[in-house]
């Protein structure tokens, strides 16, 4: 019995090593679990379910095989793949989750997010995020030819990379007040998210009660996967010095 969590693989053209790591994980490790949660940015960009890349099709096939052996799959979109939809869901076997989502993780209420909405200090990003997700903007974009959509996505990706390079690290990280507010609003003990590419386990208190925030890592330099059993967590990431820790109780 185990539940897996991954995020921020950013699969796409020219990322053969990451693609191979992902396929290996999905075919050799994940089948031993009961559930897999993908918390966004599985793909570097996703321009619509009608235009999957070769890399995307390979991952969809691997996910479907995992679903067919009985593993429950969940997908919560990130800032790079928020156009993943029902066609992807049906093909891969993934259930689409809203952001945020709350699950019962072996008796512990746990909040799942991609994590970008917690980076409230990056005002420019939050404004751009809200603008890009307007229904009218999405309808217009999805009506464009695939080649145009791909060009727009690549341009936005370049702009995002340039934005990140010119921002202080503190602005690009989550805001602690936003984290604590999310935990209060949803009445949960712990939070699991990705987005920042800073894998870590943070312990703190909210209103005098212990709380836990687990940050999933990117896959650029190796696998980053979190697993949880009734006995606790194991964080498979070379950047985590103490990979085993408890599922927060109380």
From Swiss-Prot:
Keywords assigned by UniProt, alphabetized: Cell inner membrane, Cell membrane, Hydrolase, Lipid A biosynthesis, Lipid biosynthesis, Lipid metabolism, Manganese, Membrane, Metal-binding
Membrane topology of the entry: Peripheral membrane protein
Pathway stated in the Swiss-Prot or TrEMBL entry: Glycolipid biosynthesis; lipid IV(A) biosynthesis; lipid IV(A) from (3R)-3-hydroxytetradecanoyl-[acyl-carrier-protein] and UDP-N-acetyl-alpha-D-glucosamine: step 4/6
Cofactor: how bound: Binds 2 Mn(2+) ions per subunit in a binuclear metal center.
Binding site for Mn(2+) 1: 8, 10, 41, 197
PANTHER family, sorted: UDP-2,3-DIACYLGLUCOSAMINE HYDROLASE, UDP-2,3-DIACYLGLUCOSAMINE HYDROLASE-RELATED
Record-given protein name: UDP-2,3-diacylglucosamine hydrolase
Gene (UniProt): lpxH
């Amino acid at each position: 019995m185990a539940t897996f969590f991954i995020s921020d693989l950013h699969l796409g053209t020219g990322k053969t090593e990451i693609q191979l790591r992902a396929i290996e994980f999905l075919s050799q490790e994940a089948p031993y679990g009961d559930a897999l949660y993908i918390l966004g940015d599985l793909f570097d960009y996703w321009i619509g379910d009608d235009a999957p890349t070769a890399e995307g099709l390979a991952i969809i096939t691997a996910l479907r095989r995992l679903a067919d052996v009985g593993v429950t799959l969940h997908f919560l979109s990130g800032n790079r793949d928020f156009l993943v939809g029902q066609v992807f869901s049906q093909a891969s076997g993934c259930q689409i989750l809203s952001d945020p989502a709350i699950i019962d993780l072996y008796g512990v209420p746990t909040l799942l997010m991609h994590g970008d909405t917690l980076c409230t200090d990056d005002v420019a990003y939050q404004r751009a995020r809200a603008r890009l997700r307007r229904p009218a903007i999405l309808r217009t974009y999805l009506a464009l030819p695939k080649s145009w959509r791909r060009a727009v996505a690549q341009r936005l990706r370049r702009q995002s990379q340039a934005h990140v390079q010119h921002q202080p690290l503190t602005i690009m990280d989550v805001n602690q007040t936003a984290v604590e507010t999310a935990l209060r609003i949803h009445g949960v003990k712990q939070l699991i998210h990705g987005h920042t590419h800073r894998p870590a386990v943070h312990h703190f208190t909210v209103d005098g009660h212990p709380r836990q925030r687990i940050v999933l890592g990117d896959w650029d330099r190796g696998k980053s996967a979190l697993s949880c059993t009734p006995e606790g967590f194991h964080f498979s990431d070379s950047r985590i010095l103490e990979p085993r820790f408890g599922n927060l109780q109380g």
